[in-house]
């Protein structure tokens, strides 16, 4: 059976709300989460039918924006 090689660019927008005391601490927390995701090298997606499909990650990049204080 022949195989196919696909290069896919996937942009995910993830909003994380945390209890950090400052924008710097908040950015540090989110950076740590992104770096751990970089190390995982695999992500799993839950399909509508309940099955799970795993995808290998390579050359992943991230950018953190809009670290701001939330109103209480």
UniProtKB/Swiss-Prot annotation:
Q: Which domain of life is it from?
A: Bacteria
Which protein, by its recorded name, is this?
SPbeta prophage-derived uncharacterized protein YopT
Gene this protein is translated from: yopT
Q: What do we know about how this protein assembles, alone or with others?
A: Homodimer.
